Amino acid sequence: ATVVAPKYTAIKPLGDRVLVK
């Protein structure tokens, strides 16, 4: 999800994977 939400990855790397799914 780094490409989808690069800002979210910096704030919540773990939640970033949840957003993708």
Swiss-Prot record:
Its main location: plastid. It is found in: Plastid, Chloroplast. Keywords: Chaperone, Chloroplast, Plastid. One of its GO terms (cellular component) is chloroplast. Forms stable complexes with CPN60 in the presence of ATP. Belongs to the GroES chaperonin family. Seems to function only as a co-chaperone, along with cpn60, and in certain cases is essential for the discharge of biologically active proteins from cpn60. This is 20 kDa chaperonin, chloroplastic. It comes from Pisum sativum. The gene is CPN21.
